[in-house]
């Protein structure tokens, strides 16, 4: 692929993701960036909201300013919207070099969003090159290609610390009621102890309590020996095991995860997965959108498959 991108001087890692409409452009960029020696962490292809949120989550969780993101969907707008749901992520859809320079200069953009429909690989390289080389507060089209005035420069300096706090949880003041540490050590456990659980009819042995409707979050319990037949969801989900032991087979990726107390697992949207509970297990789960479930096999088929693997 032809293009103007040159090797980056400083250590740099780019986390990438796309939906079906942006997959080809994303793959082309991944191949080229790796050829330049840039460390690329590719999260693959999923729905635009899952792709954007997964890249945003990983960039947000990084402690390094040199970890950035690159996301692609049909328009470049959807992936940017969901990447921006995470603190410290400043995603911008850039259709031109000018967009990229403005986004870096003004907003310190750290996630670049491309349109797989509108942007060619050659143009994407030019946009990326401008984006990666433009420092914060540098002259840009919005400044008339001149240095920012001292007033605006001061504003931009202050904006970094102020923007980074948006979306973060804030500590309560002196009037906030404190949790009694003698009865509960974490908020999730406190919620679980004081809520009624509803049986999950489609999953024998399971019960759940929804603690937020949209995006859906819930505390879920399964009895030892329970099996979740292969199924999938419209939205990806994160879960943390509070107590117990379970095995999750991601049939889409042909991977297995054995989880115990404190373990975390993310399952992308649409991935078909099967679950076996080895002990009474309780976990917290949150979806990227509204909860739903679609079965891909019956219970007996699932049990037989697990027995054959054992």
UniProtKB/Swiss-Prot annotation:
> Superkingdom of this entry's organism?
Eukaryota
Domain Cupin type-2 intervals: 219-282
Gene3D superfamilies for the chain: Jelly Rolls, Sugar-phosphate isomerase, RpiB/LacA/LacB
| Annotated GO biological process | carbohydrate metabolic process; DNA repair
Q: Enumerate the GO terms in the molecular function aspect.
A: isomerase activity
Annotated keywords: Acetylation, DNA damage, DNA repair
Q: In the record, which positions carry N-acetylalanine?
A: 2
Q: GO CC terms on record?
A: cytoplasm; cytosol; nucleus
InterPro entries from the entry? ChrR-like_cupin_dom (IPR025979), DRT102 (IPR012100), RmlC-like_jellyroll (IPR014710), RmlC_Cupin_sf (IPR011051), RpiB_LacA_LacB (IPR003500), RpiB_LacA_LacB_sf (IPR036569)
PANTHER family cross-referenced by the UniProt entry:
DNA DAMAGE-REPAIR_TOLERATION PROTEIN DRT102, RIBOSE-5-PHOSPHATE ISOMERASE B
The name under which this protein is listed is DNA damage-repair/toleration protein DRT102
């Amino acid at each position: 692929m032809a293009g103007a991108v040159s090797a980056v001087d400083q250590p740099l890692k780019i986390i990438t993701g796309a939906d079906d409409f942006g997959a080809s452009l994303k793959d082309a960029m991944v191949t080229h960036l790796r050829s330049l020696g840039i460390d690329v962490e590719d999260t693959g292809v999923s729905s635009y909201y899952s792709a954007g949120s997964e890249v945003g989550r990983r960039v947000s969780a990084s402690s390094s300013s040199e970890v950035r993101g690159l996301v692609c969907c049909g328009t470049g707008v959807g992936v940017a919207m969901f990447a921006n749901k995470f603190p410290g992520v400043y995603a911008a859809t850039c259709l031109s070099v000018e967009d990229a320079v403005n986004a870096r200069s003004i907003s310190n953009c750290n996630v670049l969003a491309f349109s797989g429909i509108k942007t060619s690989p050659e143009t994407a390289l030019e946009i990326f090159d401008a984006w990666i080389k433009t420092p914060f507060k540098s002259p840009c089209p919005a400044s008339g290609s001149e240095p920012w005035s001292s007033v605006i420069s001061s504003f931009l300096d202050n904006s970094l610390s102020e923007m980074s706090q948006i979306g973060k949880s804030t500590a309560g003041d002196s009037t906030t009621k404190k949790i009694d540490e003698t009865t509960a050590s974490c908020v999730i456990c406190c919620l679980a102890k004081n809520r009624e659980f509803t049986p999950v009819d489609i999953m024998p042995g399971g019960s759940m309590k929804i603690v937020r409707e949209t995006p859906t979050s819930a505390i879920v319990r399964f009895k030892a020996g329970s099996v979740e037949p292969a199924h999938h969801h419209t939205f990806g989900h994160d879960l943390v095991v509070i107590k117990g032991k379970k095995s999750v087979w991601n049939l889409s990726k042909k991977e297995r995860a054995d989880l115990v107390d404190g373990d975390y697992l993310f399952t992308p949207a649409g991935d078909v997965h099967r679950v076996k509970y080895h002990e009474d297990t309780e976990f917290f789960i949150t979806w990227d959108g509204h909860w739903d479930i679609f079965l891909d096999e019956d219970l007996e088929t699932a049990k037989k498959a697990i027995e054959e693997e054992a």
